C-alpha cells in the first residue's frame, strides 16, 4: 500500500495554482517560492480585512512530535485562535494534562525499559505495528508486561500480569496502585523530595482508596492489584505508553493525571528505561 501511495500518478509533487474557474480542474505548476509568497499575501489580506479571528487552520500532525508545535506557534504570531486537529479527538487530554503536570508529553524508552503497562492498549503485528515491535523486543529482553483490559486481548494473553478491570475504572485502579506504593514505601523518595509538590495532600487523597474499595470499584482481586503495583514500582525503569483508549473513556482526565503521578512518584521520568521529556526545538523559539 505504501509504495502505491508514494508512487501514485495523481500524488501532488509540486505546488499547483488553479487557473480558470473553480471546478474546471485547470492547474499551473509554480515554484515553492511563488506559492509561499502568494499564500502569505492572501493570509495578510484576510487578517487586514477580518482580523486574525477570520482564519482557521487544520492540521493532522501531532504538535508534540511531528511539527514541534510550529503550526501553533505560527498561528500564535498571527493572533489566530482557530486551530483544528484530530489530536483534540485522540490525545487532547493526554497532551494537555502531561504538559500541566511536568511540562511535556513523555515518550517511553522501550529499548531499555524493564516494565510496560498497557491501559486497554492492544498493539498487534498489523495494528500499531511499531509499538508492537518495541513491546516484543522489550519482552524478549525480559521486560514485564502488565495489561489492564476487561477483554482477554492478544496482549493480555501473553502478559505477565493481566488485570481485568471494569471499563472506565482506570482512575480507581491507579489510586489503588498508589496506595500500595505509598504504604510499602516503594516510591522514589529523593525524586519526590526534589521535584514533587503536594505530596501530603496526594497521600491523604490516596488513603481514601484502600484496596478493598478499589477492588469493589474495579472488580479486580486485591492481591492482583498489589502484585501489579509492585511489579511497576520496583522495576528498574518502567513506562506507561500513551493510548487513545485512556483519552476516550469515563474519567479520562483523572486517569491520565494519575498516570502522570505514577511516573513521577516512582522516579520514572527522564531516566534510562523510563519516560523521557523532550521540548520545543530551541532553534524555533
Model-found features: residue ranges?
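Scaffold signal of the M16-like zinc-metallopeptidase fold and its non-catalytic homologs
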Residues: 8-12, 179-209
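A glycine-rich, hydrophobic/aromatic-adjacent loop/helix-cap motif
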Residues: 232-285
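Short acidic alpha-helix initiation/capping motifs at coil-to-helix transition points
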Residues: 15-16, 65-66, 202-209, 253
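Conserved short loop/turn motifs at secondary-structure junctions
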Residues: 56-64, 217-220, 243-251, 282-283
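Flexible, glycine/charged-enriched surface loops at secondary-structure junctions
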Residues: 50-54, 187-192, 239, 270-277
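Conserved thiamine diphosphate
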Residues: 109-112, 116-122, 198-218
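N-terminal export/assembly segments and adjacent metallocofactor-ligating motifs
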Residues: 1-184, 221
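Core structural elements
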Residues: 203-205, 226-237
Amino acid at each position: 500500500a505504501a509504495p502505491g501511495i508514494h508512487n501514485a500518478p495523481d500524488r501532488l509533487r509540486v505546488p499547483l495554482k488553479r487557473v480558470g474557474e473553480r471546478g474546471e480542474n485547470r492547474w499551473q505548476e509554480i515554484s515553492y517560492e511563488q506559492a509561499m509568497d502568494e499564500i502569505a499575501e492572501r493570509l495578510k489580506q484576510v487578517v487586514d480585512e477580518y482580523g486574525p479571528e477570520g482564519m482557521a487552520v487544520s492540521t493532522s500532525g501531532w504538535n508534540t512530535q511531528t511539527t514541534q508545535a510550529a503550526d501553533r506557534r505560527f498561528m500564535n504570531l498571527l493572533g489566530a485562535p482557530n486551530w483544528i486537529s484530530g489530536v483534540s479527538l485522540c490525545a487532547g487530554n493526554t497532551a494537555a494534562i502531561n504538559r500541566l503536570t511536568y511540562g511535556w508529553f513523555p515518550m517511553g524508552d522501550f529499548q531499555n525499559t524493564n516494565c510496560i503497562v498497557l491501559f486497554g492498549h492492544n498493539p498487534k503485528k498489523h495494528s500499531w505495528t511499531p509499538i508492537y515491535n518495541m513491546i516484543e523486543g522489550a519482552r524478549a529482553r525480559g521486560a514485564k508486561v502488565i495489561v489492564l483490559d476487561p477483554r482477554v486481548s492478544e496482549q493480555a494473553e501473553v502478559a505477565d500480569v493481566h488485570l481485568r478491570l471494569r471499563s472506565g475504572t482506570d482512575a480507581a485502579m491507579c489510586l489503588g496502585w498508589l496506595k500500595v506504593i505509598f504504604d510499602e514505601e516503594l516510591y522514589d523518595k529523593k525524586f519526590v523530595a526534589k521535584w514533587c509538590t503536594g505530596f501530603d495532600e496526594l497521600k491523604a487523597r490516596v488513603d481514601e482508596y484502600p484496596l478493598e474499595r478499589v477492588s469493589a470499584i474495579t472488580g479486580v482481586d486485591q492481591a492482583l492489584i498489589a502484585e501489579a503495583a509492585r511489579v511497576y514500582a520496583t522495576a528498574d525503569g518502567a513506562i506507561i505508553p500513551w493510548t487513545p483508549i485512556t483519552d476516550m473513556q469515563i474519567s479520562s482526565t483523572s486517569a491520565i493525571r494519575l498516570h502522570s503521578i505514577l511516573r513521577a512518584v516512582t522516579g520514572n521520568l527522564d531516566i534510562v528505561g523510563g519516560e523521557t521529556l523532550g521540548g520545543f526545538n530551541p532553534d524555533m523559539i
